[in-house]
Amino acid sequence: IFIFDPHILSKLSNKADARVEFILSSLAFLNVQFAQRNTSLYVKHDDPLRAFQQLEEEFDVQAIFTNHDYERYADERDSSIRNWASTKQITFNTFKDQVIFEKSEVLSGQNTPYTVFTPYSRRWKERLGLHPIIQFPSEDLSNYLPCTLTLPTLDVLGFQASGIAFPGKGVDHSLIQAYQAQRDFPAKDATSHLSVHLRFGTVSIRSLVQKALGVSETWLNELIWRDFYFNILHHFPHVSQGSAFRKEYDRMEWRNNEVEFEAWCQGQTGYPIVDAGMRELNSTGFMHNRVRMIVASFLVKHLLIDWRWGEAYFAEKLLDFDFSANNGGWQWAAGSGCDAAPYFRVFNPTLQTQKFDKDLAYIRKWVPEFQELNYPQPIVNHEQARVRVLA
């Protein structure tokens, strides 16, 4: 069963939102596999509670099985379905799936949540050694209802094709091996692009951890960061309500210049590495992680624009948008988050270019006019911006 929730879809102002298309194409692929077993997905476009109520009227529902979701709305939604199910004597079973360790499974020696990544990751790895990943194939245990059902179309859902190409699910062993040495260079095809699959559950976090073990500690740590930010979301729910992790940063005075924000959004800041990242995001729904740090630092520290503005723009554009990771990344850049970059660390876009795109291959791809007269002048002077933010 899959439910397209109007509460979520109605908030997507871009009717060519690629995430809806990705989900629908993934469901179609799964439906082809189900057809081989003479069954289909049951897909609804409705309020989730109402969809289950209709399902209960149509079938003899005895139990519901789903996986944990950690965001605020999802938790409230699942609680309402659980409460309804109990009135119908339907058991509601929910399981951990999208993380390796959740909630309070990784705590400090004082039984408190970690707010710094390094000790968290150390304890995470210790627990993995005590609780190794075990395969539980389900094919021989599955019991399918014979049926043939059709999926809704993008048009029925109120959306249209995006034109964005979606990454595959595969990852080469050689890429994982070379990840530490190659990961910071955006012109290289050195990252897996699996984040969208992790976000929507089309690849298993457990299978990726198994691929990383003994091959790349750095690649494994990137997966652990996901668990870490889910951990922060669970233990410090105020971050899901527009507040800084470090609440004193909520008193920060921002310039919030709307003209400069629009220039940042459109990749017209006059800083080629920043503009390349934003244009890549706008065109593909993806941005290299090193460049994400550069553009976020630029918005917050060069332009003194509230990190929440950037967080919201990324939430709209990123194909792999995940609230906890997006929020954590933006608060890291702003210095307001847990284990954040220190406030005095201000990325110099020019030096970042020299280090990570010295041949300008990435910039030439996305900002081909950067050496032409029609390319905009920098909207802010780096040294002056650095002095201003540190004042």
Regions found by a protein language model. Give the residues of each.
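Trp/Phe/Arg-rich N-terminal binding region typifying the photolyase-homology
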Residues: 1-128, 215, 279, 391
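A short alpha-helix capping/helix-coil boundary motif
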Residues: 7-11, 30-33, 59-62, 131-139, ...
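Glycine/tryptophan-enriched, flexible segments
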Residues: 88-90, 111-249, 352-391
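Charge-dense, low-complexity intrinsically disordered segments
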Residues: 13, 17-21, 166, 264, ...
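Active-site-proximal binding-pocket segments
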Residues: 190-364
